Amino acid sequence: MMREIAASNYPVIVYESKHRAVRFLEELAAAAQEKGREVVVSVARELTKLHESFYQGSPEAVLKEVQGDVNNLKGEFVILIRPKKKVQTS
């Protein structure tokens, strides 16, 4: 499934529990690297609650931020994965 998500040309939204979110990001980073795809990940954690957090960047960067957050294992995660847009230069 991760390979399909990493290779998708469309945004994918995933809802993950606190127990699976870190592993999901690790597997996504590996799949994107394997496919040679650049993806952007946006993570929203604990929406509308006290410890609400947002992260955005490459899977590796977001994973590092989530792992460094002392509240990272609280609540649910909404993860949006989309292909990185290539900027055309003229």
Predicted regions and their residues:
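Class I SAM-dependent methyltransferase SAM-binding "motif I" and its flanking Rossmann-like core
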Residues: 1-8
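A contiguous loop/helix-start segment that scaffolds small-molecule binding in enzyme catalytic cores
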Residues: 10-90
